[in-house]
Amino acid sequence: MTPRELRADVPAFQESAYLNFGAHGPSPAYVVDAVSDTVADHEFNSGADDPYTTAFASYDRARERVAAFIGAEPEEVALTESTTDGINRIATAVDFEPGDVVVRTDLEHPAGTLPWQQLEAQGVEVRVVETTDGRLDIDAYTEAVADARLVCFSAVTWTHGTQLPVSELVDIAAEAGAFTLVDAV
């Protein structure tokens, strides 16, 4: 599906542009229809099928489609309620220990800062790579991640709209042995 095809499927886009997709936004008509059908089926046919079986089958199909789209295996895809939820799940899933290092930029949405602030109270060092006018200094980033356990940054920053060089930053983190968490909403 191309962006133009997606735009044609969203009734709200016929007369305007919508730019606030970080938190919510209008859906394609087929998404609204699918949600309506699911609610109606649950309300009127809940005795006919196990709703959990139906829901899990839907999750599995969605995971398979996302995996195919991004070139991953379905078991590598996690479906979360939001980016905030996903970041929090990762922050609590990694077994951080006192002295571990998490690196982030100063451009992050609160969802990309608050989990790490909580870990600071447990002895995890959080390094913030400062930027200038929304621009990231690659040398400063490389130095900051040298001994990091995890690096968290946004593909496109929410305050400046800066597009960070994701592939390069991921490669630098990988060379340092760090996990990378990219907010790519």
Language-model features, listed with the residues they occupy:
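Pyridoxal 5′-phosphate
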Residues: 1-185
